[in-house]
Amino acid sequence: MREQNSAITMNRRETLRLSLVAALTGTSAIPGKIQAMQDSDMKAISLPELPPKPSGDVAAKLFPGFEQTEVRTSGASIRVLYKGAGPPVLLLHGYPETHVTWHKVAPRLAERFSVYVPDLRGYGDSSRPADGDRHLNYSFRAMALDQIETMRHFGHEQFLVGAHDRGARVAHRLCLDFPKSVKKVCLMDIAPTLTMYRQTNQEFATKYMWWFFLIQAAPLPEHLIGLDPQYYLEYNLSVLNKTPGALTPEAVSEYRRCFCCTSTIHATCEDFRASVDIGLKMDEADDRAGNKIVAPVHALWGARGTIGPLWDVLATWRAKATSTVTGRSLDCGHFLQEERPEETLEELQRFFGTV
């Protein structure tokens, strides 16, 4: 039985690989092979709609002393962990992770700051709203409003922001839509979304293939990822992480718990669809209006990742900001806060320290 299950798993992974090739290249010969495999043993995989309930032990271990609650915003229910006293700091995660990505940094940061670590809508244990017209409910604007309302729930009209990957794109929108709320912003391992799409080349499209796969119309990406979501998730993490062992088993287990369900797979696809549809329209409108970030910006990126080698990161953000833009690379891949937590903590403390 174990050998049979292993063979089925391998067939599912081969089907996922072939399906991706067919979807991204328009190849017509491959689907016949896929269909043959599906007819033999590729029965529909039964995935839960929502993530299983989290274990309190995991939260206590990864975020000792943090409290957690759900904040009802005007468009979603946001799960957030919080701890500390001092200037408020909002930490935002990216794809395909959750707030857990901050587990090596947030507890130490909470020694000096009031730290808030939410799951973005559609991710982790936050809710999954309906898509909305042109994927509006998963736009960075909708996600930014969640964060404003979450911080106001805790009594904060102004705050500091540290954000990674998709969360950093939410932070960019937060700075544009609510300029008086963000005192400083640290943007990690991204260049501006509009800049990246406009300057896409073969190397970027190859290394960040999910940027172009996930924007395809439903249910294509959802179906293909759903064939083996654990493999897809762990492949994504492995190609972006350049520091062996940096992603702890406890963290990966949480990413797996939250990602491997139908609602998360769909919601995270909607995130990418929104960014390339209505999100780019919003960015273009800001460019035309001269709407730029007014808060001081500190950019960090992985020297062994994709963004730094392909873009002049500081130059891209100076083009989008009116205040000072500082930053540097760290010797790692994409997941700075997990691969280089001590340096990331030092950068955040230094940047946020003079408010």
Where are these regions (language model features)?
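Signal peptide processing junction and immediate N-terminal pro/mature segment
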Residues: 31-39
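N-terminal export leaders
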Residues: 12-20, 24
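Active-site glycine-rich loops that stabilize anionic/oxyanionic intermediates
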Residues: 86, 94-97
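Flexible "cap/lid" subdomain of the alpha/beta-hydrolase fold that forms the substrate-access gate
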Residues: 39-69, 75-80, 85-88, 116, ...
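Serine-hydrolase catalytic-loop signature spanning alpha/beta hydrolases and amidase-signature enzymes
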Residues: 96-104, 115
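N-terminal secretory signal peptides
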Residues: 1-10
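Active-site machinery of serine-nucleophile hydrolases
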Residues: 110-120
